[in-house]
Amino acid sequence: MEDKKDALISKTISMLLDNGFAVADISGQFSASFDIIARRNIERYVLKVLYNIDTLKPTTAYQLAKVAKFLRSTATIVGEKAGGGPLEDGVIYYRHGIPISSLDTFRDYINGEKPYIYSGPGGFYVKINGEALREMRMKMSLSIGYLSHYLGVSRRSVSLYENGSSATIDVFLKLQEIIKSDLVDHTDLFKIIPDNFQEEERVDDVYIQMLLDILERIGLDTKPAYRMPFDILARDEEVVSLIASLLSEEADKTKIEIMKKISSVLEDDAFLISKHSTTRENINGCPVINIVDLEKMTSKDELLRMLEKRAR
């Protein structure tokens, strides 16, 4: 299974590079909730690759969604199979609120072909543009009763479609037969946001909690990071996104290299925080700030200025 997953990761990275993305590959280097960070101009993705999408755990999904939110990116999973069969191309699947697709579907998506079919209980569905349906039905002088009979559904179902509910593929195709117009609600199925972001997370490390409190005080929204190559996620309401890690006694070079990779791809700041006084201002291109200096700061701008200075 791991060999198949590794092969899919390699294919995904090659596809992203071929399509003009800058890529940070952290798969195999760290047991993280994501495998790939990618950016192309303003498009930013945090990707997890799974051979079988049914192996996704709720905790992994939450961490993936959280890091994507804080890095102003889209969380998505590239997979190959669900249950006993392959993922259908052109279809979006969801597990624990995270959008999932085949590699070919994701390739089409980043090249402008947005899928409009999604997998749900009992089959595949299309979200209907209710306003367009109502407008065309009235323009064609079709009653709700006539349309329900033609479609083989209840009058209530037609009313629900006109209020933006989804229809099965079979019903949608029948709708298209009689109403030859675009009836798809073109909501980006990759941009649907999970609703569990406010989940409370216990922080056992007193230093991590202290850092979260300091960053909150200077104007940043923060979250602890678990199963990631950093300890803290932070952002403001505008454009700032940060990742930070508590510096251990012996600097973890692999961890620092991964943070630097992510920082470089997304063009966001990554920095290390020392518990003790240190003369080091930079490790392998990653700025270092000691916790005492951080405590003295009164604004996020002060932090950003120091990061810019020490990143040189």
UniProtKB/Swiss-Prot annotation:
InterPro entries membership: Arc_TR_HTH (IPR020886), Cro/C1-type_HTH (IPR001387), Lambda_DNA-bd_dom_sf (IPR010982)
Keyword Phosphoprotein: no
Segments of the chain annotated as binding DNA: 144-163
Protein name: Putative HTH-type transcriptional regulatory protein Ta1363
Start and end residues of each HTH cro/C1-type domain: 133-186
Gene Ontology molecular function, alphabetical: DNA binding; DNA-binding transcription factor activity
Annotated keywords: DNA-binding, Transcription, Transcription regulation
Top-level taxon of the source organism: Archaea
SMART domains: HTH_XRE
Pfam families: HTH_3 (PF01381)
Gene3D superfamilies: lambda repressor-like DNA-binding domains (1.10.260.40)
